[in-house]
Amino acid sequence: MGSKRRNLSCSERHQKLVDENYCKKLHVQALKNVNSQIRNQMVQNENDNRVQRKQFLRLLQNEQFELDMEEAIQKAEENKRLKELQLKQEEKLAMELAKLKHESLKDEKMRQQVRENSIELRELEKKLKAAYMNKERAAQIAEKDAIKYEQMKRDAEIAKTMMEEHKRIIKEENAAEDKRNKAKAQYYLDLEKQLEEQEKKKQEAYEQLLKEKLMIDEIVRKIYEEDQLEKQQKLEKMNAMRRYIEEFQKEQALWRKKKREEMEEENRKIIEFANMQQQREEDRMAKVQENEEKRLQLQNALTQKLEEMLRQREDLEQVRQELYQEEQAEIYKSKLKEEAEKKLRKQKEMKQDFEEQMALKELVLQAAKEEEENFRKTMLAKFAEDDRIELMNAQKQRMKQLEHRRAVEKLIEERRQQFLADKQRELEEWQLQQRRQGFINAIIEEERLKLLKEHATNLLGYLPKGVFKKEDDIDLLGEEFRKVYQQRSEICEEK
């Protein structure tokens, strides 16, 4: 029973293990199924999400496409509107530019006509041309004077060069003369030295001769002592020797005297040469001084001549300017006189015209009154004839006559209004003409100032009188021009 129980237990355990393994397998299988379901569900969810995402993206793309299309349409409409606006602006700008160009051409044409027809501008251009001619003439005179000055300067330089060359030659000659004098002096010194050496040699020879004489005397004495027999011969020999010595001494004295005389003559010649050299040097210095004075005189003469020429040129230019200014002043005076006479004549003509106009106005008014009166009578008569007033009773006659007078007065008032309208139109035309004349005068003034600004600076100092109408013209040309113009005016007044 015990073994059976043990066997059962083993079977049970085995069965239990089998059951447990089976349960585990079932559990694993269930887990696998669950995992598979979960994976499938996740895949399904992911597919659904992908589809939803694609649908959402497609929806967004459609909305973005619609927005882009709408924006493109709006942008195209805006571009079209901007192009139309730009086209209108360009057309407006082109019209304005054409208008400005037309006005500019019209203004330029009018200015050209004013320039061509303005007497004042033509006179100013003539004066400016005359100033340019004066400037050119002054430049030519200055150029001629400059050429003369350069010629005189070259002549002065040539004279200076010749003087320097002359001085150099004199200096070289003096240097050569000094060199020769030094050579002569050295020669005389060498000669004197040779003479001294010769004198010294002769003195030494003389001393040697004396020594020999003493020796001879000693020998003679010894010979006299030794050989009495030969005494006479020796004495004669001694006498001969003495005579020789005496003759030698005489000759030496004569030679010394001659040499002294020669030395004195040489010294005299040297002194004469030195005096002559000094005199020559003094003559040379005097000649140099004379040449220097001549050069200075020539230079002063050239300078004075140049100054005289410059002064004559300035005087001539001043005379020309004064003559030109006087001529221009006379022209200006005659012009002022003509303008005054013209103005006076114009005033007289205007006065006469005014009187004639007043008289004519009186006549016109009188004629108008007479015409109105005649017109009134005529119209009243016409109305009366048309309406047969005489056939009416008194009340109707008065009413009809009053009606006729009113009609006539209305016609007369209409004629008056027409007359006033005509006069108003004439006044407006006259005012327009005055404005046009004022505009023309402004153009003339602008062109005049333009000409002055363009040419006055280049013609400063050559402008004739009458170019500037007022002081403001000078101020308009700048501070520097005004200062230079005032300085030149002060210089002309001082002259």
Swiss-Prot record:
Where is the protein localized?
Answer: Nucleus; Cytoplasm, Cytoskeleton, Cilium axoneme; Cytoplasm, Cytoskeleton, Flagellum axoneme
What PANTHER family is this protein classified in? MEIOSIS-SPECIFIC NUCLEAR STRUCTURAL PROTEIN 1 (PTHR19265:SF0)
Q: Which cysteines are joined by disulfide bonds?
A: none
Show the segment(s) annotated as Interaction with BBOF1: 1-314
Assembly, per entry = Able to form oligomers. Microtubule inner protein component of sperm flagellar doublet microtubules. Interacts with ODAD1. Interacts with BBOF1.
Keywords, A to Z, come to: Cell projection, Cilium, Coiled coil, Cytoplasm, Cytoskeleton, Disease variant, Flagellum, Heterotaxy, Meiosis, Nucleus, Phosphoprotein
InterPro entries the UniProt entry points to: MNS1 (IPR026504), TPH_dom (IPR043597)
Q: In which tissues is it expressed?
A: Expressed in nasal respiratory epithelium and in the sperm.
Disease per record is: Heterotaxy, visceral, 9, autosomal, with male infertility: A form of visceral heterotaxy, a complex disorder due to disruption of the normal left-right asymmetry of the thoracoabdominal organs. Visceral heterotaxy or situs ambiguus results in randomization of the placement of visceral organs, including the heart, lungs, liver, spleen, and stomach. The organs are oriented randomly with respect to the left-right axis and with respect to one another. It can be associated with a variety of congenital defects including cardiac malformations.
What the protein does? Microtubule inner protein (MIP) part of the dynein-decorated doublet microtubules (DMTs) in cilia axoneme, which is required for motile cilia beating. May play a role in the control of meiotic division and germ cell differentiation through regulation of pairing and recombination during meiosis. Required for sperm flagella assembly. May play a role in the assembly and function of the outer dynein arm-docking complex (ODA-DC). ODA-DC mediates outer dynein arms (ODA) binding onto the axonemal doublet microtubules.
Any idea what this protein is called? Meiosis-specific nuclear structural protein 1
Keyword ATP-binding belongs to the record: no
Q: Which residues carry this modification: Phosphotyrosine?
A: Y188
Pfam families, A to Z: TPH
Can you tell me which residues the record assigns to a coiled coil? 28-410
Give the family, as the similarity comment puts it.
Belongs to the MNS1 family.
For this chain, one GO molecular function annotation is: identical protein binding
Q: Name one GO cellular component term.
A: intermediate filament
Q: Which GO terms describe its biological process?
A: cilium organization; flagellated sperm motility; left/right axis specification; meiotic cell cycle; positive regulation of cilium assembly; sperm axoneme assembly
